[in-house]
Amino acid sequence: MTENTKTGLALALEDWRILINDDWRSLAVALYMVLIGYGVLVGIPVISTAWVTKLGFTEVEVGRVAGMDLGGLSAGAIVTAWIINRVNRRILVFIGIIIAVVANGMCLKYVDYDTVLWLRFLAGFGSGMYTAVAVAIFGMSIRPALAYNLMLFSFAFSQALEMRILPQLSMNGIYWVFIGCFLATIPFLKWIKSYPKTRPVEERSSTNDSNARYALFLPWVCLFAIFLTYINIGAYWTYIELAALDSNTNPNLVSEVLVWASLCSLLGCLIATLLSNRFGLLRPLLIALFTMAMGVGMLAFGINE
């Protein structure tokens, strides 16, 4: 009875306590895994520049290599989603690590475009398997929305860190960072539950039943929205640093802007969390879409200083 009467900060702290006490080890390793698994995605501006400046790829080739890497990430995640309830999760993670490490290791030796193209697909596929298990762990937690918020907040810091560190490394150095981060997961595989634990299913009210047909379509609408969002991200995020450097912008300024833009996403996550707690999910989403559309529109129509 006391828990139901809590509001505001007290309720938020109680939710955090429940989430952490549920299975903090599994949550911790899943958080690490999702940050490493999405490492190429969030660091793609820096990595794309490295492919051009250090390996001599053209901008068209960079787009294809990045597309293969992220396409592999998607393919690995889809395959894992099909089998995750029937296969030991530790085995799935271990297989993903092996594939990603071997593919990244071969990239140390092979630098020609055709070979790198397929090696990046394999690396992405392994990352997709690895990351899909981590995302599933968040989804099966006792407070999934809070767990995903934690993931988004953490992305801001990991992305800023990548933007700061990766430009200082050689191409092989970047590959070694990913190899080391994947291998560092192995000692903690025992923290991952082999199979999802069952939770009691809550009874649905008659109000929910009346909206059942909408509930069936809602996940697919959300997936389609995510699909379109990531197409937009891929369209500019791969080339954002290359485009800035091509226009003779100071490289140090470009690096600083990317770092601070990453940290600003932390503020966006905080505002979205506060708004969603008070007004639900729709209004923060509409505000975010309007803000992004306005920003891209300003850039498209000549704001370049």
Range-by-range predicted roles:
Residues 64-73, 255-265:
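Transmembrane alpha-helical segments of major facilitator superfamily
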Residues 91-105, 283-298:
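Structural signature of the two symmetry-related core transmembrane helices
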